[in-house]
Amino acid sequence: MLLRESGIIKPYASPELAKYPEEAKTKADASRVHWVTDREAYLGFGYNTRMITSAQVPKNFQELLKPELKGKLAVTTESSSARVIGSMLKYKGDGFMKTLKEQEVRLFKLASLGFLNLLIAGEIAGSPTVFRNQVIVMKEKGAPIDWVPLDVAVANAGGSAVIANAPHPHAALLLTDFVIGGEGQKLMEQFRYGVAWKEYPFKREYPERGMTTAQYQDAEEKWSQLLRSTTQR
């Protein structure tokens, strides 16, 4: 948002754009975009399989309130956690957030991978703010963890754009074509990222969609405050 509003990036066209859904493109005009989503990381419920049984795993936001999960949940201070809180507020409302506070959710000042390592070690039993791609990688290495989507899977999306004053604009366009094309997207999948034009068995949520930079900053601050007031340190 800020890059577009500041004029740092410029509109571009690519033959690869046709396969991308409209929601994955920030349109500049009828044929050009400011950027297109080239990778997505999805946030959902990650849990230690030795500490939470299959019967206890929540299938939606409401089931985070199960009595057997009280005192077992945690989140981080990362902005990604605030985005999940924003989605909970959107779909479940203030009353749900007040009840969630009674679950004694712990708050950790950690980046996502450090937080995941606590989950693997059993310091944390489960969290609704865990990245699917990170769980897949660690699960493949034998870690006792798994991941499920809830009502929505909040997407952290990365995009490909062209810098306005790129010294070699044609090379920049070729690189962008590669990244958003078939071969580039295969590379993204090797890192277990999601692909914007593929279907997944969950609904994706983009909290920032339709907002200006200022609107999103205000919303994220509100969500962060709600995150802190709902959790325990």
What positions do the PLM features span?
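Extracytoplasmic ligand-binding site segments that recognize negatively charged/polar headgroups
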Residues: 1-120
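Short, hydrophobic alpha-helical packing/hinge segments within bilobed ligand-binding/sensory domains
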Residues: 115-118, 134, 172
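Periplasmic-binding protein-like
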Residues: 41, 69-76, 99-101, 106-109, 141-166, 179-199
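A bilobed periplasmic-binding-protein/Venus flytrap-type ligand-binding module shared by bacterial periplasmic
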Residues: 44-52, 156-168, 187
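Short amphipathic alpha-helical coupling segments at ligand-binding clamshell hinges
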Residues: 96-100, 167-179, 187-188
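An extracytoplasmic/periplasmic, membrane-proximal ligand-sensing/linker region
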Residues: 193-233
